[in-house]
Amino acid sequence: MNEPLPRPAGALWGLVSRPSWRELRLRQEGRDLEAHPIWTGTGVPPGQGRHIVLVPGFLAGARSLSMLEPWLQRCGWDTRRAPVGRNHQPGEHVVELLEEWLAETTAMEGGPVPVIGHSRGGQEARVLAVRHPDAVSLLVTLGAPHRVLYPPHLVVRAPAAALQLAAWIRRSRPDLTGHRRYEADRVGPFPSSVPFVSVYSHSDGFLDWRLSLDPAAEHVEIDCTHLGLAASVPAFEAIARALKSL
């Protein structure tokens, strides 16, 4: 947990600081996944109809869960994909939506439920678990930037800045109170009662793996792309191991 943070990124460095071409492996990762026994549920703990909340990544929306969600359903889980669209709204606004979704899901389940978040969705899911530890039975984050609000890569930082500015203009003034609250819970103490697994990859083409390190989490290193953290054999194996703890 003493790994230094990546160097601050200017525009040019932010563009080239991560080898984004690694993400070209994603298609092959998908083919490998569909040919692997885990894709049909082999070795995966059966969900037995239990509910599970899924939070998609930044700008990707449902696409980032296009393999994870049907796989969990095939394994017997009743998936509840969070209604956050492409997940481009300010973090506090997204978490407010997640809080309503979590309340509905736990009411349906009759108790706490596991939450899985990819990329920015994992960061938001951490905030959700901090605020509602009694409603979350397990938190699994996949390539989540726990140590910064947004990764320094220009592919992420540029649209994030533009969308944040647009959101502030629409609201006439920034929600600074909400932003401060979100930031405090993003990096603040995590409830010891909630199992927390942070999965990351050194081969991530967008996010420096060190940004996924959280002092409260069990860290699981795998080898895949950033998008493959929700669509690859090693990612699904890591998720299956985490679900076995329930």
Segment roles from a protein language model:
Residues 9, 18, 43, 124, ...:
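Sparse, context-dependent recognition of short Cys/His-centered cofactor- or disulfide-binding micro-motifs
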Residues 192-246:
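C-terminal catalytic-base region of ester-bond hydrolases, centering on the histidine
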Residues 51-63, 67, 73-87, 91-187, ...:
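Serine-dependent carboxylesterase/thioesterase catalytic core
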Residues 42-45, 49, 56, 75-79, ...:
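Residue-level signal for well-ordered alpha-helical segments
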Residues 13-37, 117-133, 145, 196-206:
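Contiguous hydrophobic segments
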Residues 68, 132-133, 154, 212, ...:
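Amphipathic, positively biased hydrophobic alpha-helical segments used for protein targeting
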Residues 1-53, 60-71, 75-82, 105-108, ...:
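Flexible, membrane-associating and regulatory peripheral segments of lipid-active enzymes
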